[in-house]
Each structure stands twice: as structure tokens, then as C-alpha cells.
Amino acid sequence: MLYVQHWSFKTVYHKKGTEKFLAGGGDYPGVEMIGRYHAPGSLEGWIVLKTDDPKAIYQHAAEWAEFLNWKTTPVFTDEEAGQIVAKINS
């Protein structure tokens, strides 16, 4: 399943969070990271993930909870969404 995570730094945690990221804390065990994107000039970004184990996403978010706010959304590709809509419309 695909997921999109939106992250944003909590107030005053940018420096500590970036230090953790640069030290390798951005690794995402148990999850295929399709891409991680950073909004220029801001303190937020997005991660596109693929996994059959949402517990791995929960664990990673919990490890970063001191520094980041998270919003995790399961998403479908156009092909997957099309199949669902086709069933509804049949």
C-alpha cells in the first residue's frame, strides 16, 4: 500500500531534528521510501512510502515525535482508484 506522510517541525526543534536527520536518523527500516521531499524555505515536507506493514510507519513517526508533527494518509494510484470507481459505477 502507498502512503504519503506530511511532516513539519515543531516549534524550536529544527536544529535538533536536522542534526538527527544528518546523523542518519532519516532511514526508514521496513518501508520502501519512494521519495522524500523538502519544501524550500519552510520547515515541512512529504515522504511517499510503500509498505504492507503500517506498524513500521507508526514506529518511525514515534521515533521522530519529539521533533516533528505528522499526518499520514493512505493513497491509491490512478490505476487503483480507477478500479474502485469502476466497481462503484457498474
Please describe what each predicted stretch is.
Residues M1-S90:
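Conserved, structured core segments of small domains
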